[in-house]
Amino acid sequence: MTIIVKAPAKINLVLDATAKRPDGYHDVHMVMTTVDLADRLELTELASGEIRMNAQHAYVPNDERNLAYKAAAVLKERFDIKSGVEIYLEKQIPVAAGLAGGSSDAAATLRGLNELWKLNLTLEQLAEIGSEVGSDVPFCVMGGTAIATGRGEKLEKLVSPPPCWVVLAKPTIGVSTADVYGALDLETAERPDVGAMIDAVKNQDFTAICESLGNVLESVTLPMHPEVEQIKAFMTSCGAEGVLMSGSGPTVFALTEHENRAQRLYNGLRGFCNEVYVVRLLGENH
């Protein structure tokens, strides 16, 4: 039996880190939402009991370093599943981009295996298991839009922002999330107003959403990688209503209500970014 699942990317509309935790992670306070750029996974049951990963991408590992593999291993051990699974992964989300591609693959694996192995777990139960795999996995299990706290695993559902176009641009660099958080100085970094973003989303106020975009990690990534700042400036000059780096970067996104403006951004960015996407916010369900 084979199950096909989609793994959509996420963006952070606002991201603040509030304190460093004893476990080395940071406490975060953020609003995340899903977009319709997605990886595709095919999960096929194996009688042998092994987990076999088949990622069609040079920079994506096929072993326990892959979060989808790790998710399958955690679920298999937790419920003492005898059968195995082959995970065929077709990547569309850029790698090491701040878009939670790996976390979303893990979440999609959990959702798919719940069906394949007939576990009948709720999304909440899958999200709890996902927190063992990675901080962004619980959000990716639930999808939609949410306020995240703790390491990112504590979620409060939020109405999704009004529909708009999202232009994603990833420069040809990779950024290590651990390195960015490690270099973060909470004393000097400019901190975003998370409450203002939550209010803007609840009020469905697109202008206020664009004005409230903020990411404390820009204070680290932008000085390290000037090309990220250049992309932000270019997007603003092309008339994007809101511009922000997603996660630890290096991907930058622009929000606009106008399709022709999104297309203009895409055409301009293709000149100096080989990974550019025009997508939509996914809304409540995926």
Swiss-Prot record:
Binding residues annotated for ATP, in chain numbering: 94-104
Alphabetized UniProt keyword annotations: ATP-binding, Isoprene biosynthesis, Kinase, Nucleotide-binding, Transferase
EC number: 2.7.1.148
Domain of life the protein comes from: Bacteria
Catalytic activity: 4-CDP-2-C-methyl-D-erythritol + ATP = 4-CDP-2-C-methyl-D-erythritol 2-phosphate + ADP + H(+)
Swiss-Prot/TrEMBL GO biological process terms: isopentenyl diphosphate biosynthetic process, methylerythritol 4-phosphate pathway; terpenoid biosynthetic process
Active site: residue positions: 10, 136
InterPro entries, per database record: GHMP_kinase_C_dom, GHMP_kinase_C_sf, GHMP_kinase_N_dom, IspE, Ribosomal_Su5_D2-typ_SF, Ribsml_uS5_D2-typ_fold_subgr
Pathway where this protein functions: Isoprenoid biosynthesis; isopentenyl diphosphate biosynthesis via DXP pathway; isopentenyl diphosphate from 1-deoxy-D-xylulose 5-phosphate: step 3/6
Enzyme kind, highest EC tier: transferase
Keyword Iron-sulfur: no
GO molecular function: 4-(cytidine 5'-diphospho)-2-C-methyl-D-erythritol kinase activity; ATP binding
Family note: Belongs to the GHMP kinase family. IspE subfamily.
Function field: Catalyzes the phosphorylation of the position 2 hydroxy group of 4-diphosphocytidyl-2C-methyl-D-erythritol.
Name under which the protein is recorded: 4-diphosphocytidyl-2-C-methyl-D-erythritol kinase
Organism: Exiguobacterium sibiricum (strain DSM 17290 / CCUG 55495 / CIP 109462 / JCM 13490 / 255-15)
Gene: ispE
